[in-house]
């Protein structure tokens, strides 16, 4: 049984999902859970992208033990230097360098020749090897590359010291039988293939990322790059949970180190921190994945779950909670439930989360897992409060012009503003904008119920942009949806100020 290495790129390619902007603490929390999940490699980020990205990767490299910690770098010395500076304190560092190899990318994007690309790839791998014994090389857009050139460049980078060669379907163009055949032919034609592992990285533009990954695996790929919940650019990447459970359920002859009972926790954590909801009918981790509405199906499942369920929910860690949390629940019960849901908070954050839980319990008769996840995901999002909401009053109704009065503190100084608007939320946002003189544009606002019932928590999401087009996302929850909307707006503004300043 051959070992299959799981390379998780949730924190790099997954974070490139439109609207996702994880901070340093959120990235670390996800990385710690990925280590519990027992992935083999965590691609922590792209250090050259920004100072914040560099610090987040460095933080993970220093604090997360177990998996190999990889950092992405273009095939240029400046990127490779920065990648190494970020991951050099990891127990097991890897530099992952890449360059495009398809003619359309070489000619239209890089403005180079094949020979120049080959030379740059070899130079990059040799340069990375000066720092790190473990170097991965990716041929961007490999699927649309000339096969003979692909063989030539892979042979050259292996000769230069690459320990892993990665074959990406960058635009999600391949069909499963084509992609499997490509991997088989590469393994047969690369003369020094015994000196490196073959990896694949599939995108989901045609909905085939998981199928293509599995086809590659059965044709000899030894590493698969994937993300939790299939996050990623455009239509996303191959979903880690789908690949792993397909191998487990169908008993394919590959050894996978993933602790499947951590899958559900990891999925929920990533969804809560990124703000990207899991579609209800998502395979493995969707809310409806183990739901049965048909009477015939329900009868069968009651008699024997295996009639319609090929996976035992407990296998992926879906908790069977017998504990109902409410206002009489203690901290130990609360902490135990957090751990079952995949959260491990330091004492100070646990105290604050428990305090907020008690406040919510006074307003709601029964606290659900979704309530807890909403509370804690907000707790993890540690952003300095340059602006803090001190007072909020809204007057609205039929025949009344919606009016918001707010008091915001900035460096100890209180700012009071009053504004009218086209509805209570609009009035609140106009009042905040008037008080907080930070250039920005409101790109998106949404409000949803976290749970059912009239006492449900409402979650507000606000997306802002600065003058350079950078996106900042704020989220907040409250049983008062107007309060949640105001807090979400301020959190997005605080994130903007933290990263860009006030100008």
UniProtKB/Swiss-Prot annotation:
It comes from the Bacteria. It is an enzyme of class 2 (transferase). Its EC number is 2.3.3.13. It catalyses: 3-methyl-2-oxobutanoate + acetyl-CoA + H2O = (2S)-2-isopropylmalate + CoA + H(+). GO terms for biological process: L-leucine biosynthetic process. GO terms for molecular function: 2-isopropylmalate synthase activity; acetyl-CoA C-acetyltransferase activity; manganese ion binding. Residues 388-503 are annotated as: Regulatory domain. Mn(2+) binds at residues 13, 201, 203, 237. Residues 4-264 form the Pyruvate carboxyltransferase domain. Pathway: Amino-acid biosynthesis; L-leucine biosynthesis; L-leucine from 3-methyl-2-oxobutanoate: step 1/4. Its cofactor is Mn(2+). Disulfide bonds: none annotated. GO terms for cellular component: cytoplasm. InterPro entries: 2-IPM_HCS-like, 2-isopropylmalate_synth_dimer, AIPM/Hcit_synth_CS, Aldolase_TIM, LeuA/HCS_post-cat, LeuA_allosteric_dom_sf, LeuA_bact_synth, PYR_CT. Catalyzes the condensation of the acetyl group of acetyl-CoA with 3-methyl-2-oxobutanoate (2-ketoisovalerate) to form 3-carboxy-3-hydroxy-4-methylpentanoate (2-isopropylmalate). Belongs to the alpha-IPM synthase/homocitrate synthase family. LeuA type 1 subfamily. Homodimer. This is 2-isopropylmalate synthase.
């Amino acid at each position: 049984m051959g070992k299959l290495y799981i390379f998780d790129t949730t924190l790099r390619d997954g974070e490139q999902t439109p609207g996702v902007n994880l901070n340093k603490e959120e990235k670390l929390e996800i990385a710690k859970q990925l280590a519990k999940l027992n992935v083999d490699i965590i691609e922590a980020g792209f250090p050259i992208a920004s100072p914040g990205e560099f610090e987040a990767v460095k933080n993970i490299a220093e604090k997360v033990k177990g998996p190999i910690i990889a950092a992405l770098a273009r095939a240029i010395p400046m990127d490779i230097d920065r990648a190494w500076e970020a991951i050099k304190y990891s127990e097991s560092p890897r530099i992952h360098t890449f360059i495009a190899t398809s003619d359309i990318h070489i000619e239209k994007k890089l403005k180079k020749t094949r020979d120049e690309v080959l030379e740059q790839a070899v130079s990059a791998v040799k340069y990375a090897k000066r720092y790190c014994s473990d170097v991965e090389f990716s041929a961007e857009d490999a699927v649309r590359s000339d096969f003979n050139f692909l063989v030539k460049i892979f042979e050259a980078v292996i000769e230069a010291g690459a320990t892993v060669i990665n074959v990406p379907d960058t635009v999600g163009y391949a069909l499963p039988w084509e992609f499997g055949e490509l991997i088989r032919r590469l393994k047969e034609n690369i003369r020094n293939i015994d000196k490196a592992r073959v990896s694949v990285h599939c995108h989901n533009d045609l909905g085939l990322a998981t199928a293509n990954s599995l086809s590659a695996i059965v044709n000899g790929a030894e590493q698969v790059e994937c993300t939790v919940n299939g996050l990623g650019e455009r239509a996303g990447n191959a979903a880690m949970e789908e690949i792993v459970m397909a191998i487990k359920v169908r008993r394919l002859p590959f050894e996978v180190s993933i602790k499947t009972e951590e899958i559900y926790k990891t999925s929920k954590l990533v969804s809560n921190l990124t703000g990207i909801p899991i579609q209800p009918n998502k395979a493995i981790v969707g809310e409806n994945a183990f739901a049965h509405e048909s009477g015939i199906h329900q009868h069968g499942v009651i008699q024997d779950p295996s009639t319609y369920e090929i996976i035992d929910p407990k296998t992926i860690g879906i908790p069977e909670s017998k504990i109902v949390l409410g206002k009489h629940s203690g901290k130990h019960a609360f902490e135990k439930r957090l751990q079952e849901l995949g959260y491990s908070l330091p004492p100070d954050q646990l105290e604050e989360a428990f305090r907020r839980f008690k406040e919510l319990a006074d307003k709601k008769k029964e606290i659900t897992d979704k309530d807890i996840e909403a509370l804690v995901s907000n707790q993890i999002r540690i952003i300095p409060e340059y602006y803090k909401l001190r007072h909020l009053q809204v007057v609205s109704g039929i025949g009344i012009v919606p009016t918001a009065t707010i008091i915001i503190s900035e460096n100890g100084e209180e700012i009071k503003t009053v504004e009218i608007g086209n509805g209570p939320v609009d009035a609140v946002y106009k009042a905040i904008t008037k008080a907080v003189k930070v250039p920005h544009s409101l790109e998106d606002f949404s409000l949803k119920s976290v749970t059912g019932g009239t006492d449900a928590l409402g979650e507000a999401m606000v997306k802002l942009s600065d003058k350079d087009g950078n996106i900042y996302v704020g989220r907040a929850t409250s049983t008062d949806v107007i309060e949640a909307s105001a807090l979400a707006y301020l959190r997005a503004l605080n994130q903007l100020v933290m990263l860009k300043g006030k100008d």
